[in-house]
A protein has these predicted regions:
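Structural detector for internal amphipathic alpha-helices that build alpha-solenoid repeat scaffolds
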Residues: 1, 19-34, 52-67, 77, ...
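Amphipathic alpha-helical scaffolding segments comprising HEAT/armadillo-like alpha-solenoid repeats
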Residues: 1-12, 33-47, 66-80, 99-112, ...
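Short terminal alpha-helical segments
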Residues: 6-14, 23, 155
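Short coil turns that connect the paired helices of HEAT/ARM alpha-solenoid repeats
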Residues: 13-19, 44-52, 79-85, 112-118, ...
Length: 244
C-alpha cells in the first residue's frame, strides 16, 4: 500500500466536505479488508488526539471483522451526532455488527435508559431493526414509553409494532400511552401501532370512537387513521362499534 496515498485518504476523514469523507470511507473500507497495514493505521488514527472527526474512522473499522471496543464505543457515541443521516448510517452499521456480535444488543439496551435523547431514539430503532423477541429488549422498549422526552416515546411506540412477543403487555402499555400521554404525537403513534397488533379491546375502541367525534383535529385525525387500519384488519370489531 502506497504510504502517501494512505496518508491522504486518512487525512480526508477530517475534511469538512461530506462527499470527500464518503469517498475516502468507501476506499478505505475496501483497502482495510485486504491490508493489515491499513487497519493498523486506522486504529492508530482512532485514538489520536486533535482530530476534527472520529466517526468516519470508526465507520470504516466497523465494517471489518471483530471491531475493537474503541470502535464500538465511538459508533455508540456517534448516535448523538447532530446530523440525522450520520446517525442513521451508524445505527444501520451497528445493527449489522450486532448480528454477529451479540454484545452490541446489550449496549443498545443500556443506551435506551442512559443515553442522550438522540442516542435513545437511535438505540430503539436499532433494537427494532434487529427484530428481537427477548424479554430484556422488550422491557427496554416498554420502559421507553415513559421516557421524559416525547420523541423517545414516539420511537418506542412505533417500534413496538415489530414485536411478536409479549402481545398482552405490549397492547396494555400502548393503550395506556394512548389514553394518558400528554403529547398528541405519542398518542397518535400509540393508536396506530395498537391498531396494527392483535384484537382491539373494548376500551381502545371506545376511546377511538370518542376521539373521532372530538373537536380536537389532531386527536380526530389519529383516531380516524387507527379506525381505518382496524377496519381493514378487524372489520367485525368496527362494525360492532358502529352499531352501538
Amino acid at each position: 500500500m502506497d504510504t502517501d496515498r494512505l496518508t491522504a485518504l486518512i487525512a480526508d476523514l477530517d475534511h469538512p466536505d461530506k462527499p470527500t469523507i464518503r469517498a475516502a470511507v468507501d476506499q478505505l473500507i475496501g483497502l482495510a479488508r485486504e491490508s493489515v497495514q491499513v487497519r493498523t493505521a486506522l486504529e492508530q488514527r482512532l485514538v489520536e488526539l486533535g482530530h476534527r472527526d472520529y466517526w468516519p474512522v470508526a465507520y470504516v473499522l466497523g465494517h471489518l471483522p471483530q471491531p475493537s471496543g474503541a470502535t464500538i464505543r465511538n459508533l455508540l457515541d456517534t448516535l448523538d451526532h447532530r446530523e440525522p443521516d450520520i446517525r442513521w448510517a451508524i445505527v444501520l452499521l451497528l445493527v449489522r455488527i450486532a448480528k454477529t456480535e451479540s454484545s452490541i444488543i446489550n449496549l443498545l439496551i443500556e443506551l435506551c435508559e442512559n443515553g442522550t435523547t438522540n442516542q435513545k431514539r437511535m438505540a430503539i430503532y436499532g433494537l427494532r431493526d434487529l427484530v428481537l423477541n427477548d424479554v430484556v429488549s422488550l422491557q427496554a422498549l416498554l420502559s421507553s414509553l415513559s421516557d421524559p422526552d416525547p420523541t423517545v416515546r414516539v420511537a418506542a411506540a412505533t417500534s413496538l409494532k415489530n414485536r411478536t412477543d409479549g402481545d398482552e403487555r405490549v397492547r396494555a402499555a400502548l393503550l395506556q400511552s394512548y389514553l394518558l400521554d400528554a403529547d398528541i404525537k405519542v398518542r397518535s403513534a400509540a393508536a396506530v401501532t395498537l391498531a396494527n397488533i392483535g384484537l382491539p379491546s373494548e376500551e381502545f375502541l371506545r376511546a377511538l370512537k370518542e376521539a373521532s367525534e372530538s373537536d380536537n383535529s389532531q386527536s380526530k385525525k389519529a383516531a380516524t387513521v387507527a379506525l381505518a387500519l382496524l377496519e381493514k384488519r378487524e372489520p367485525a370489531s368496527i362494525a360492532g362499534m358502529r352499531q352501538r
